[in-house]
Amino acid sequence: VSHIQAYLYQNGIVYPRYIIEDFFALIQTNDLIILAGESGSGKTNLIKSFAKAVGGESIIIPVKPNWTSAEDLLGYYNPLEKKYLSTPFLDALFEAKRNPDIPYFICLDEMNLARVEYYFADFLSLLEERDKDNPPEIKLYSEDESSHVSSELKMVLSLIESTKKNLDKNHIEDYVGILEDKEVNQELRRVFGFSDKNSLIKYHSDLKRMLSGILNTPASITFPKNVRIIGAINIDETTHYLSPKILDRAHIMKFDSPLLNNWVAIGDEVKINENSHLKLKFKIEDFGERTPYPSFDMEDDFCKQMVDLTQVYFSPLGVEVGLRTIRQGLHYKKLFSIFNADDNLAFNNFLVHKILPKMTFDGSIKIEIKERGLLTKKDILNEFLEKILEIFKNYRNNNGIDAVRELKSIIKNSTSNEDIVNYWA
């Protein structure tokens, strides 16, 4: 991390260490990462810069507002042309497949200009498969289509060979020779049932296009191990909120304006040496493997803490926290510890990534809670703030997005918005 920070610094790109630590740990999870922040806060620049520093490739795919299905992301098979119409995203996956030793960071820029669940939900479900020896397989079109093209090609070759044999023209070795030989040309037109408007040249061209289509775009592709998917979102009146399904599976990494950074402190962090100008060479495994999340264990302090918080606060608030979320938290904490041993910072980051983004509800709704009486959701949220302050009572976060500060901001904003709680507002 120190080398990456110094390399970027020497190239005029300034990021505090905590951002690089957090991003690297999230990259290693193999989960979907969504960078959230104002336009110009450095979201896509982080992806490009990080990729450059680690000897990788970054590909930025702009999302369009009219994306409504997986076809907009992955393309579709055109049965009339017998050809697969690809997309920049799919092309990027194939490029990564051809270069398995290079890490690829594919960014869906302005991801929420369209509803993410419309075009990305199926793909996101595939990413849930976490067997490193059996990577997810992305089905692009039916195997029957490629079989049909292969069968047609075999039939054509068979008819050509039999026609040459019947006319004693076995000396003809290529398609040009067939076209130049009037007798063979005419017989093939008859065998194929061509009308006067059809030509062997056009038919040959169509066959080449169909064959090229199935060779260039096979019916399926296994998700490349060297690819990480990252989304970048802005929140304004032109964008859509992320659905619960997306929030449950993704990690949200929030960005403040770079103008709020402590530039002097960042300069003090950077450790320049004679090798700082060199890119690092990583193995693909250094970016994490798609292995199962750690098991849920009630003897683990983090698991016990999350169960307690869920029962007392999250469930009454309607904030969905299941085993997946807790296991993702265990996974992130383990990976983050490689770069930073601060457990409090890891828990702070987890709250910012996985819990606070789910906080959207009407705070004025009243709930009867056993042994606590009738409370509004806003009351429960304030109690949660007190609990977090207690957890962090001996800890001061000077690194990045502070969960306590964020929670206070959520509560303050709701007060001026008729108690409507919305993390994204």
Regions found by a protein language model. Give the residues of each.
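Alpha-helical lid/collar subdomain of P-loop NTPases
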Residues: 265-425
